[in-house]
C-alpha cells in the first residue's frame, strides 16, 4: 500500500541528500515533492538544480522555467538557471539572468555575486 507522504518530510529528506551530494536520492524525493506541491517554486528550483548536477540539462531547464513561471523574481532560480546556461555554453542567456539579478539586488546579493563569479570563471577558461 502507498502511505501518505508528508511533503515537508520529503523536502527535508531531499535537502539532506543534497548536502551529502546524493543527487539520485534527492531527485526521487524532489520528484515526489513537486507532485505533491506543484506550485512551490523553490521545490522546482531544487529539482532542477539536482537534475543539473546529474547533467540532465534539458529536464533541468524545463524545471527552472516552471520555477520562474511561478515566481519570476526567484533569485535562487535565476542564479542556478544562469549557471545552467554557462554549463551549456550559452553565456548570453547567463548574462540576461545576471542583469535580472542586478535589477532585483541593486546593492548586491549572494545570488548575483555567485552567478557573476561563475560567468567570470567560465570566461577566463575560454581565454
Question: Where would I find each of the regions flagged by the language model?
Answer:
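Terminal, low-structured helical/coil segments at or just beyond the last alpha-helical repeat
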Residues: 1-7, 95-127
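Alpha-helical segment of the N-proximal tetratricopeptide repeat
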Residues: 5-36
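Start-of-helix register in tetratricopeptide repeats
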Residues: 8, 42, 59, 76, ...
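Structural marker of alpha-solenoid helical repeat scaffolds
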Residues: 36, 70, 103-107
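Canonical tetratricopeptide repeat
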Residues: 46, 80, 114-118
Amino acid at each position: 500500500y502507498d502511505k501518505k507522504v508528508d511533503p515537508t518530510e520529503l523536502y527535508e529528506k531531499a535537502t539532506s541528500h543534497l548536502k551529502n551530494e546524493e543527487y539520485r536520492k534527492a531527485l526521487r524525493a524532489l520528484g515526489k515533492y513537486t507532485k505533491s506541491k506543484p506550485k512551490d517554486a523553490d521545490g522546482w528550483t531544487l529539482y532542477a538544480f539536482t537534475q543539473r548536477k546529474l547533467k540532465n540539462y534539458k529536464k533541468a531547464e524545463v524545471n527552472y522555467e516552471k520555477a520562474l513561471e511561478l515566481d519570476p523574481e526567484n533569485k535562487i532560480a535565476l542564479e542556478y538557471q544562469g549557471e545552467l546556461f554557462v554549463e551549456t555554453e550559452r553565456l548570453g542567456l547567463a548574462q540576461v539572468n545576471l542583469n535580472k539579478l542586478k535589477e532585483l539586488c541593486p546593492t548586491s546579493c549572494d545570488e548575483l555575486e555567485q552567478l557573476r563569479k561563475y560567468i567570470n570563471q567560465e570566461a577566463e577558461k575560454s581565454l
